[in-house]
Amino acid sequence: MNQERLIAAEDITFRYQKDADRPALDHVSFHVSKGEWLAIVGHNGSGKSTLARALNGLILPDEGSIKVGGIKLTEETVWDVRKKVGMVFQNPDNQFVGTTVRDDVAFGLENSGVPREDMVERVDWAVQQVNMQEFLDQEPHHLSGGQKQRVAIAGVLAARPDIMILDEATSMLDPMGREEVLDTVRRLKDQGMVTVISITHDLNEAAKADRIIVMNSGRKFAEGTPQEVFRLNQDLIKIGLDLPFSFQLTQMLKESGLALKGDHLTQEGLVNELWTLKSKM
């Protein structure tokens, strides 16, 4: 993985109210490397969504600093930073502003004054990346939740940011829609098109990331690969997080004496190893 740092957050603190007893972000430091998928997880009120807003300049930290693509985030640089960061939010219906898929993907480009010929090329390219090219002239009420979120991702891609932040972007989708969106994100990330930060309370979603930061009470509680973080097990449960079912089942099978080698984050991985063990019996 290319280790160029796209985001460097150093000791950031933020309070929504200056006299608040506890800050929403309490001396948080981390970095994000180019080409990485970082998941930031936590229960409601943990600080994860506040962190997402800080990374896009929707709020500015009271203390500490954030650099995005080498640019220090300030009131003067916030629009330069936002050109580098695109966001996909929770509710797909609240994000759809065009009358058709084509209009929606083009909306941000029109506001940025992109020439029409360039805009048409970008829209066509972006919808192809999310496999929505057959729906260009469809109205939003004809689309599923997963399809609307893929259109939102296309709108972000068309603007050509370095980083895409998914702020609970799958939480209102059914399982099929959720997998559609996450598979799309993984493919775009693997093809080197964008660096991904996903904000979520769902550890099944976080398991797909390269690295996880766990937030609790405004502080960084843990950080590591999915396997490293999930091994905290009961510590995560105590702060209101549910471990992925496949990981829990793997641990139960190991405790019962089954000689499993992996800490499986997906059901597919667990099933494959079980079949391998069965074939050796």
From Swiss-Prot:
It is a peripheral membrane protein. NCBIfam families: ECF_ATPase_1, PRK13635.1, PRK13648.1. InterPro entries: AAA+_ATPase, ABC_transporter-like_ATP-bd, ABC_transporter-like_CS, ABC_transpr_CbiO/EcfA_su, ECF_ABC_transporter_ATP-bd, EcfA_1, P-loop_NTPase. ATP-binding (A) component of a common energy-coupling factor (ECF) ABC-transporter complex. Unlike classic ABC transporters this ECF transporter provides the energy necessary to transport a number of different substrates. Forms a stable energy-coupling factor (ECF) transporter complex composed of 2 membrane-embedded substrate-binding proteins (S component), 2 ATP-binding proteins (A component) and 2 transmembrane proteins (T component). It is an enzyme of class 7 (translocase). Pfam families: ABC_tran (PF00005). Keywords: ATP-binding, Cell membrane, Membrane, Nucleotide-binding, Translocase, Transport. This is Energy-coupling factor transporter ATP-binding protein EcfA1. GO terms for cellular component: ATP-binding cassette (ABC) transporter complex. Residues 7-242 form the ABC transporter domain. ATP binds at G42, H43, N44, G45, S46, G47, K48, S49. SUPFAM superfamilies: P-loop containing nucleoside triphosphate hydrolases (SSF52540). Its EC number is 7.-.-.-. It comes from the Bacteria. One of its GO terms (molecular function) is ATP hydrolysis activity. Belongs to the ABC transporter superfamily. Energy-coupling factor EcfA family. It is found in: Cell membrane. It comes from Bacillus licheniformis (strain ATCC 14580 / DSM 13 / JCM 2505 / CCUG 7422 / NBRC 12200 / NCIMB 9375 / NCTC 10341 / NRRL NRS-1264 / Gibson 46).
